[in-house]
């Protein structure tokens, strides 16, 4: 199975998480600023990741990445999403960027895999929650970094 992990990162935390995920999936790791439309299309499983900045914004390189997604043929493509957020300082927009990626890929007909439970997190609102579950893996490297390895491992077993 061919897997591409495409991520955006400024501080390096999302890049580090993407690297761990890619290593466990034996995947090709791609920074979104270097991605092409083919990178989104030419794989069996597409994994996308972004931190949430400010009041729910995608990482800035994803602005162009979302445009590439709009050009890509994703109908029926299995897509898994992961995101980083800070539930303590941003409880009103916790991991919202994940919801934006979800909207972008589902609009293109992608099949989302890897929904996760919201239990164990404390936040007020998140655009990453649909039907009572997160649309992908959510990591809080600010307040719950010690839980990330277990969360990644559990999520990976779910998306394979």
Which residues fall in each region the model found?
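N-terminal beta1-alpha1 ligand-phosphate binding loop
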Residues: 2-24
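FMN-binding flavodoxin-like domain, especially the glycine-rich phosphate-binding loop
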Residues: 16, 24, 28, 42-160
